[in-house]
């Protein structure tokens, strides 16, 4: 599948191992992994950042193979999941940064165009999340209040 607003195909990706059991060299218990996830979430880290930290610093390749459930499901079970999905959050953050740039550089036409593309992605993703009930049906992206969402 290609990119939305460019010509790239984006075909390179890592392969998830077929074996669903944890590797033999992972000695960490499921309860300890969940505790690490809770600590990181309370510090304010996003689920993908938590996964990277667990992989790089603690040697846990896949949380699902160790605990039986994914990081976001564990966070939801403990009430620590972010209210806005992570990919939407970072798109909103990007739009806020572009708007801030445009306040200082009003004649930057390319940034104006890129802002339109980013906001198109935000609206499309928000529509999907409303349909799948990950966002409330009354949720709406507004550029004036976007900076409060990512602050």
Swiss-Prot record:
Cellular component annotations (GO), alphabetically ordered: cytosolic small ribosomal subunit; nucleolus
Pfam families membership: Ribosomal_S13_N, Ribosomal_S15
Key words, A-Z: Ribonucleoprotein, Ribosomal protein
InterPro entries in UniProt: Ribosomal_uS15, Ribosomal_uS15_arc_euk, Ribosomal_uS15_N, uS15_NS1_RNA-bd_sf
Record GO biological process: translation
Single Gene Ontology MF annotation: small ribosomal subunit rRNA binding
Entry keyword annotation includes Membrane: no
SUPFAM superfamilies: S15/NS1 RNA-binding domain
UniProt cross-references to NCBIfam families, sorted A to Z: PRK08561.1
Protein name from the UniProt record: Small ribosomal subunit protein uS15z
Originating species: Oryza sativa subsp. japonica
């Amino acid at each position: 599948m290609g990119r939305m607003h460019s010509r790239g195909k984006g075909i390179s990706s890592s392969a998830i191992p077929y074996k669903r059991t944890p590797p033999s060299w992972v000695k960490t218990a499921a309860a300890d992994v969940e505790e690490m996830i809770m600590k990181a979430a309370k510090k304010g880290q996003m689920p993908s950042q938590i996964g990277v930290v667990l992989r790089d610093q603690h040697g846990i390749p896949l949380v699902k193979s160790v605990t039986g459930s994914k990081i976001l499901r564990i966070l939801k079970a403990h009430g620590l999941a972010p209210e806005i999905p992570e990919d939407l959050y970072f798109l909103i953050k990007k739009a806020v940064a572009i708007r801030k740039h445009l306040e200082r550089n009003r004649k930057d036409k390319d940034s104006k165009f890129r802002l339109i593309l980013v906001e198109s992605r935000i609206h499309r993703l928000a529509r999907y999340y409303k349909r799948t009930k990950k966002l409330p049906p009354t949720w709406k992206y507004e550029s004036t209040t976007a900076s409060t969402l990512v602050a």
